[in-house]
Amino acid sequence: MGKPSKTAFFSAARAWDWQSVTALLVAAPERVETSDLQGHAALHRACAVKPGSNPALHEPNGIRTVTALLDAGADLERAVPMDEAEGDFRATPLWYAVARGENFPLVEFLLRRRANASYSLWAAVWRDDEMVCRALLKSRPNLNLQAHGETPIFYAARLKRLATLAMLIDAGADPSIVDPKGRDALTIARERRLPEQIIEKLESLRHKLHGPLPKRA
């Protein structure tokens, strides 16, 4: 009997069929590192599934399946290859759980396994998801990475995602980091005519982090 196929393994992972995933990994442990044509490992595919999206799913949130993959050696921080323009962003399994799966129980599980939350902040901002953003911030991510030249706090200000913007301000994200056009979060907040309370908080945070702006001659 030959080794199980990549197709069978990935299908089991996407179906959250944790028992089949476990059995297939016993038969072919090297499958845990296999990639599909887009560079996804089975862990990425499992994390991208949305709960309730398929009546054939074998469990409610994929945690048993993801546990089986991690216990077999799947890389928690493995990133799917992306365009260089993405900058600091990495499409990790946690990002797939946040952005594609919208699967909060799995997000919490991955964070407990010490997944790096830094790359998922933009996804939380996109949906202005306070619950996910709060969970990510608890793990003390790097708040000042840039994707397409935008930090999460700049992105939140530009998109007018006020709930997550307020959370990033409270967490101490640096509002002075500029985008490729030379604009910082305070500049874009003014351009977007965000509430004065938000503007004041951004000004206060910038002053706290960097001191007063130099006076013009």
Report the location of each language-model feature:
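Ankyrin-repeat-protein effector appendages
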Residues: 1-8, 108-123, 139, 171-174, ...
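N-terminal segments that cap or nucleate solenoid repeat domains
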Residues: 1-45, 132-145
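Ankyrin-repeat boundary/"N-cap" motif
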Residues: 2-9, 34-52, 79-96, 116-126, ...
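Short, intrinsically disordered, low-complexity terminal segments
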Residues: 9-10, 39, 69-71, 94, ...
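Ankyrin repeat A-helix N-terminal signature
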Residues: 11-16, 45-62, 84-103, 123-130, ...
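Ankyrin repeat structural motif
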Residues: 17-25, 53-71, 101-111, 129-138, ...
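The conserved C-terminal loop/turn that links adjacent ankyrin repeats
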Residues: 30-33, 73-77, 114-116, 140-144, ...
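Structured catalytic/translocation cores of nucleotide/phosphate-coupled proteins
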Residues: 152, 157-171, 175, 179, ...
